[in-house]
Amino acid sequence: MSKKFAEYSQFDLSKVNKDVLKKWDENQVFAKSMTEREGCPSFVFFEGPPSANGMPGIHHVMARSIKDIFCRYKTMKGYQVKRKAGWDTHGLPVELGVEKSLGITKEDIGKTISVAEYNAHCRQDVMKFTKEWEDLTHKMGYWVDMKHPYITYDNRYIETLWWLLKQLYKKGLLYKGYTIQPYSPAAGTGLSSHELNQPGCYRDVKDTTVVAQFKMKNPKPEMAQWGTPYFLAWTTTPWTLPSNTALCVGPKIDYVAVQSYNAYTGQPITVVLAKALLNAHFNPKAAELKLEDYKAGDKLVPFKVIAEYKGPDLVGMEYEQLIPWVNPGEGAFRVILGDYVTTEDGTGIVHIAPTFGADDAQVAKAAGIPPLQLVNKKGELRPMVDLTGKFYTLDELDEDFIKQRVNIDLYKEYAGRFVKNAYDPNLSDQDESLDVSICMMMKVNNQAFKIEKHVHNYPHCWRTDKPVLYYPLDSWFIRSTACKERMIELNKTINWKPESTGTGRFGKWLENLNDWNLSRSRYWGTPLPIWRTEDNSDEKCIESVEELYNEIEKSVAAGYMQSNPYKDKGFVPGEYNEENYNKIDLHRPYVDDIILVSKDGKPMKREADLIDVWFDSGAMPYAQIHYPFENKELLDSHQVYPADFIAEGVDQTRGWFFTLHAIATMVFDSVSYKAVISNGLVLDKNGNKMSKRLGNAVDPFSTIEQYGSDPLRWYMITNSSPWDNLKFDVDGIEEVRRKFFGTLYNTYSFFALYANVDGFEYKEADLPMNERPEIDRWILSVLNTLVKEVDTCYNEYEPTKAGRLISDFVNDNLSNWYVRLNRKRFWGGGFTQDKLSAYQTLYTCLETVAKLMAPIAPFYADRLYSDLIGVTGRDNVVSVHLAKFPEYNEKMVDKELEAQMQMAQDVTSMVLALRRKVNIKVRQPLQCIMIPVVDEVQKAHIEAVKALIMSEVNVKEIKFVDGAAGVLVKKVKCDFKKLGPKFGKQMKAVAAAVAEMSQEAIAELEKNGKYTFDLGGAEAVIESADVEIFSEDIPGWLVANEGKLTVALEVTVTDELRREGIARELVNRIQNIRKSSGFEITDKIKLTLSKNPQTDDAVNEYNSYICNQVLGTSLTLADEVKDGTELNFDDFSLFVNVVKE
């Protein structure tokens, strides 16, 4: 019994999704895609670890589709592609989520809840949405090993991190320093520069700013002649002014002394500021006013410049403490030099608070300026603001320090105030801020020259969304700057998609690299494996659990630990199985309880910090295989490293992409990945960021359920390049489902219907190309060209181009051209060689398309492929994803034939567009197309497909005109956007010359693609791309131009043409009735048509033609037709009765 190609009653891609998933699971297709490639070359892919403490979104479908495409493609190209899933389980996102769910803050940890209990909650919470992630991954068809993922909280994973840190330590790249760092009071930890540079961290905020007046102690004589002398310094953070200890001027900046008045108090003042910023603070109109004539409240405040200075002239001048709450000691309150001072804004004088700015701390230290620090109850030096973001309260400070250094009457009003409202749980943005309070106090005290709101760019914490502070922290750093040049050098070898991200965003980041702040003052994360003595005289960096085990043994012997907790739990060093490592926990608080012993017998405690969670993910190439404790040979022999390809969102450019690159460079002097796609954001259809709060987020689960995964994936990939932002619109998914998948499904259905009627199973040998009709040779040539181009696109990480090429082929060449032109070959009776060629050709196209589209649309590609080979048996694999990618056959490519057919398609498209312009249907014959040919090659191409064009556009003849002169009048119009920059002042003359171009000159421009003018002895060359060539319509004709091709269509409809058009229209209407009546394609019919003076002549003349086309045995005209179907034409109607014989 012959096999039949599957035929479907409806097209449901959601059902296809489920059916194919079931098939994959039952046949273990994903596993086979790797096992069947055992021994083949490896294509190495790294999966960036998401965090499972949040639900996956529609943007994750985009990111995972991109990864999946190239892994599937490379598998089909014969590579073994192993891909291991991973979970990012540590860090702020997890901790903040747990704090919120438990209703606690960081300060409660260790008090109301133990660290062990807290971390247990974190361990559980971080995997909360694992099932949802696995479900989405499964449903969208992303093949990645979810059964054996790497998990960053795993002890073996952490051990590899420790080993990597030890390598950095041994190279001198790990150090401890007390520096100003970005700090998040809301999260309670310092941040690295790459965290601070995540997208959206820098935001425009409107803050209260002040130009402060710093009263001089020892003014120059000319400065003391009018009122009180002051230095002016501007700040966007008035809360830092109580910590001011210096003013900074630029070494090459010009300054002026200006006599004027304080606009708030009306008091006379002499102020010093940068000359370049004079007009920013004084109205130039007031320069003409006399100082003596000023009255308090006048809108224009007079001013007079009395002296000029260079920055160094002001150095060493002293001033009074602006806000004398705390005495910082000797050496403060003087003017110093700083190269970073500019005149872009402010006053050209920078207020220095060494405890709250990296540049401030640096210049202050160089000039011997002390920072303003408090002493707490423990005797520790601290900045005026505590780690929660508030001024220290008096009861938190050392009593002796308060007596000696603190002005209690002034300080107590502000003690305990948060420096930002965002840090105070009891305040909103609408409440008065500390900045405003300080500015109002300064205004009253004649210390404020100008107070105003100012919009500036300010960093925010990437996880809490609250402002950061620049804060002095005792932190561990990776000296990444020491390897900066090598990172830049290696980056140039990476294939970035797009290239601009590698040279721009990422490259510029590397050029301005800072040392990596590794420390995190948190609880759930990888502990820093460094133990130190209390006096910091000795330290140990531990690289493995075995080393820690042995060091504990020494500590036990020294009496610092009673027993070895790892030995007590039965842990065996050197046994790397999961069961052994599950006996221990390398997290806090357990690792904190371990005391080691130094070389000279002192106890050593672990440094309390955790490490940056981005180090966890950046170490995944090594930690996922427990390198170097296991699988050392695999990595060292480059079987699993570096990655051939990775992909993540653009937000990872300074995140995962950087940490991968940094660790690989510093530890292995290697790249971590050879190619990377940095995909853009998925926005809503209006270009806004999606969020649940705004109600514009798209649920991926319901979208897949409604449309299936393939249309979603195809839409996302083909709508725009992966690295461009996607304006997501569900209407686009439906359009893809209908236009591409619907067209492909209909093409297959057409094939299956007739192949089943004829019993075609592709058992015959392939017909030689020279025995196939020209149309078959053409489509197979185009198909092979497609194979080559799509293969190149996939190989060059250009999935959008690949998808669009496939879509264009299916829609334009296969369905709309090949199948439509060849329907009759499939309808005809008998199984001729011509029909066999048609079947083999169409089958080959469908099977090849299934393979080409498989990486992007894995479900329907597999269904289509299985439906085809299930009958023919031409491949012995269970899935298209186990098949080989199509190979380009150059012998089947005929570029001349492709050019001819492209000409037919182009002419047809242009003529059909002209028909639509005057609303003349294609079934209405027209008399003539006139084509002025540019050259003999163009004419030959059209001649070769002349009959086809005439048939497609329904015209009686094609006339060629040698040259357009005398028949069609062409004109040229300049594209000034292109030509303007090219010709500049000559543009007017060029435009005049273009307007006067002769028909012969225009013909030359069309033929050669360029034309040279003589403009008074100077040559001017224009190209065809720089202008628009158009033709004027002539009476009774419509004209269209496209590149070198011009067509004119005669649109006059004669009576003879009208009769033929009616006959063709009747055929179409009757065929529709056959279809709606459910007739079989072989059923014969009898026709009765009502008489009508508009149609009778046409019916009589074309009676035989109509019958032949609709399988009619007779066509009779009657005065009245009972039980007929009404046929409505533009200006009349008639009835037809169709009866099956």
UniProtKB/Swiss-Prot annotation:
MF term (GO), any: aminoacyl-tRNA deacylase activity
* Cofactors named for this entry: Zn(2+)
The terms describing its cellular component in GO are: cytoplasm
What Pfam family is a match, any one? Anticodon_1
| E.C. code | 6.1.1.5
An example Gene Ontology biological process: isoleucyl-tRNA aminoacylation
Where in the cell?
A: Cytoplasm
The main location is cytoplasm
Q: Which UniProt keywords apply?
A: Aminoacyl-tRNA synthetase, ATP-binding, Cytoplasm, Ligase, Metal-binding, Nucleotide-binding, Protein biosynthesis, Zinc
- Cystine crosslinks: none
- The UniProt annotation puts motif 'KMSKS' region at 689-693
Write out the residues that bind ATP: 692
Q: Which Gene3D superfamilies match?
A: 3.30.720.200, HUPs, Isoleucyl-tRNA Synthetase, Domain 1
Quickly give the catalysed reaction.
tRNA(Ile) + L-isoleucine + ATP = L-isoleucyl-tRNA(Ile) + AMP + diphosphate
Q: Which InterPro entries match?
A: aa-tRNA-synth_Ia, Anticodon_Ile_ABEc, Ile-tRNA-ligase, Ile-tRNA-ligase_type2, M/V/L/I-tRNA-synth_anticd-bd, Rossmann-like_a/b/a_fold, tRNAsynth_Ia_anticodon-bd, Val/Leu/Ile-tRNA-synth_edit
- In chain numbering, motif 'HIGH' region lies across 50-60
Its domain comment says:
IleRS has two distinct active sites: one for aminoacylation and one for editing. The misactivated valine is translocated from the active site to the editing site, which sterically excludes the correctly activated isoleucine. The single editing site contains two valyl binding pockets, one specific for each substrate (Val-AMP or Val-tRNA(Ile)).
Query: Hey, which family's this protein in?
Result: Belongs to the class-I aminoacyl-tRNA synthetase family. IleS type 2 subfamily.
- What does this gene product do? Catalyzes the attachment of isoleucine to tRNA(Ile). As IleRS can inadvertently accommodate and process structurally similar amino acids such as valine, to avoid such errors it has two additional distinct tRNA(Ile)-dependent editing activities. One activity is designated as 'pretransfer' editing and involves the hydrolysis of activated Val-AMP. The other activity is designated 'posttransfer' editing and involves deacylation of mischarged Val-tRNA(Ile).
The subunit field of the Swiss-Prot or TrEMBL record says: Monomer.
In Swiss-Prot or TrEMBL terms, this protein is called Isoleucine--tRNA ligase
Taxonomic source organism: Bacteroides fragilis (strain YCH46)
Highest lineage ranks of the organism? Answer: Bacteria, Pseudomonadati, Bacteroidota, Bacteroidia, Bacteroidales
- The record's gene field reads ileS
